[in-house]
Amino acid sequence: QIAGAEALNGTYFTSAYSAQDKDPHVQQFIKDYKAKFNEEPDTFAIHAYDGTLAVAEAIKQAGGTDGTKIAEALSKIKDLQVATGKYTLDKDHNPVSGGIIIEMKDGVQTFKQKITL
């Protein structure tokens, strides 16, 4: 073993999700996910959920399932409330989003703050 968990103390990293985030949308997602799957959600689960909400909204705005119309609708969605925040794409179709800062303490990820870009 080169280094133990204590070697990470005081280090920080960013993520899009932490179960420690007190945001009511995040906490509702966690509650619903645990009720359905009987396990804690991970980052991939919350991203899949957010993406599904965005596509569902685009289908609604497109008035159907035509792929071209859905793509156009996705690019026009602004500030759609999803579990991790607000969903918007920039002019190059990249998501505009924030994240969270996590600090490592004694081998445990500790939520520090939410950031918005």
Describe the predicted segments one by one.
Residues 1-117:
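Extracytosolic ligand-binding ectodomains
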